[in-house]
Amino acid sequence: MKFGREFETQMIQEWKEAYMDYRSLKSIVKQILRYRLQKQQRPPPPPPPPSTGDTVPLKTDGGEGGGGGGGGGPGLSRRISLYRAFSGLTNRASRSPKKSHKHHNPLSSKRHHHHHNHHHYHLFDDDEEQIILINEDETASYTTTFLNSAEEGGEMEVQFFRRLDGEFNKVLRFYKQKVENVMEEADELSRQLNVLIALRVKVENPHVHLPPDLNSVASAPSSPHSTMRTPAPSPMDVIREMEKTEDKKVFKPAPVEMLDHVKLKIDPETPLLTLKMMILGLPSEQTFSKPELRRAEELMNRAFVEFYQKLRFLKSYCFLNQLAFAKILKKYDKTTSRNASKPYLNTVDHSYLGSCDEVSRLMSRVEATFIKHFANGNHREGMKCLRPKTKREKHRITYFLGFFSGCAVALAIAITVLVHIRGLTKSEGRHQYMENIFPLYSLFGFVAVHLFMYAADIYFWSRYRVNYPFIFGFEQGNDLGYREVLLVGSGLAVLTFGGVISNLDMEMDPRTKSFSVITELVPLALLVCLMMVLFCPFNIIYRSSRYFFVGSVFRCLLSPLYKVILPDFFLADQLTSQVQTFRSLLFYVCYYGWGGDFKRRTHTCYDSEIYKELYLVVAIIPYWFRFAQSIRRLVEEKDKMHGLNALKYLSTILAVAARTIFEMKRGTYWLTVAVTTSSIATLFNTYWDIFRDWGLMNRNSKNPWLRDKLLVPYKSIYFIVMVANVVLRLAWMQTVLGIKEAPFLHKRALVAVVASLEIVRRGIWNFFRLENEHLNNVGKYRAFKSVPLPFQELGGSKSV
């Protein structure tokens, strides 16, 4: 793989715009190469122009003499020193402060140009020509002067160095800002951990009273970092309970008195806590109980893990950009036969990007602190928690995916052949089968279609580098890829088709006047198996993903009482497209319960008043989830857009209720109500899909009527999916227009087709919804989760 593609693959996608623009610099180098090739073909062979005669010795000196000899040994050592400078950032602490912290660049000139020239000539061989001059101003911005700009074609090289300086300064500013941010966060984590240690002391010994002299060291506040070039101790150095003296260790406990000035922030995360805080309010006094300690330790654990991830990202950002500068300058040298990479890379090495080792030093402090305070001194367990889990691609997943897919296709063909051979479409029992058995199996079909659409979404999210695991908050290393989701969907399809084949008999036993009990219980057995797998406590069949799904469903069921997060309202949106699945579940209860005789394939569910009421309720429930979530977010965030979103779902609830009542009662009045409410809901939902969820239809954007940033390279795709979304939104017209059956389709099959089209529409919506969310994260450089800290000062909202 070429470096450009590898560079884009290894990027932190949310920081993509902050990386060096390797592609644009490479395009300028290609322009220089094309110009030089044309220049070589332009003049006739004899006699060469004077400019060519002047150029040949320079090329010989740079390529064979000074450039070859000086670029072979020193150039190679320069590249090695570049990699060593990055990988050994933790070793820079052992160097002298002058080299480690002062960003003195012998190639940059601020005021004394003679000093610059002195060092410059020491970096070139005697027969090498000085090509560039690099200056650094008071704002730590670098400007490169190309000294051979008067040459023919020199303006392109001037453009190259101007663009290179712009990218270098951009990277420097971003990196310095992020380092300052993590240093401030390290200060806050230090104070938070100091309070946590005091809380531990208080909980384990509530009556402890420590003399002030023992608390003096532990209570010493962390000094703010005025500059990162001073050899002051890292913020993590203040977190110490044990200090060595000459001969023994002296115990330095954290000051318990600091607990009088802070309070534990307990966000209600369970319905019981939410109701309790709504009724009683926040507790006025600290109890210093073990549950509070466990909660604080859990939050601090998550905060340290997330903070360590930030440091890893910064370290990767630093290394990749240094490597990109080395690669593009090497390509420039090869194209122009010059040796400009040596001075420029030396500047990079002595800049803040190459010489600041605060990130690596802070990483080692975080590791030591986390292992000591959260892993009981177990280095392996501590690093296992801090480092992200790498996902292993397993060949058996691909094998079983192919196996189950082949089985599903074979069974589908077998069903088609059996229906044709037996003439089941013209059988007397066809209507009985479609009214009783087909709705049972259609439930699994809806779930399988949704799984296939979700797998397609994951594939395209990965292809266009949408960071969906971060957006959904999946556990690192345990998130499912599209192969795993396809495997689950194909396995479910195999079980469903196998059950359908067992129930294809259309005639009862003439002796018993009933169907086989075993075959009639196959759909129920499949449903029970599906539920058992979903709630299986053993670590099989993607337990972490199953539990994540079950937990999200549970929070949706109690929507107003839980804080709304993206995975929960995203799942609730998925459930709004599975209304027919909920109705199929209701039919299961009725058919195998109070209203059916499964042995004779008869039921009275559609005549039951209870069933009719529940038929309406289960269709509204998914939209109620989203309505309640929007109200909760409106109350918490005070954003009026959540209120409008709640109105959108309320209009949909009214439309679904009106269509359901019209389906049961008919009549002109309910037809008018159904058409009116459905039209309003369709317009509202279509506007929200395109304008709000997808962020499209911006006429002033760089891409007219779309948005400024697009991940899909073909703009026509966006217009096609907008039209498709509107068309699929109108599937409700099948109900109000009274379309009961289509050619070769039973009315139950038609309902299943319409429901499947809604699932397909939801799958399309998913991709562009997450694309817009990802681009919002990119625009805000939001690559980390916000983890709340457990303690804050009394009388204020600030953390400790």
Curated annotation (Swiss-Prot):
The chain crosses the membrane at residues 399-419, 440-460, 484-504, 521-541, 671-691, 719-739. It is a multi-pass membrane protein. GO terms for biological process: phosphate ion transport. It holds the Pfam family SPX. One of its GO terms (cellular component) is plasma membrane. Residues 606-800 form the EXS domain. PROSITE patterns: EXS, SPX. Specifically expressed in pollen grains. Residues 95-119 have a biased composition (Basic residues). Residues 42-51 have a biased composition (Pro residues). Residues 216-229 have a biased composition (Polar residues). Residues 63-75 have a biased composition (Gly residues). Residues 1-398, 461-483, 542-670, 740-800 are cytoplasmic. Residues 420-439, 505-520, 692-718 are extracellular. PANTHER family: PHOSPHATE TRANSPORTER PHO1 HOMOLOG 9, XENOTROPIC AND POLYTROPIC RETROVIRUS RECEPTOR 1-RELATED. May transport inorganic phosphate (Pi). Belongs to the SYG1 (TC 2.A.94) family. This is Phosphate transporter PHO1 homolog 9. The lineage of its organism: Eukaryota, Viridiplantae, Streptophyta, Embryophyta, Tracheophyta.
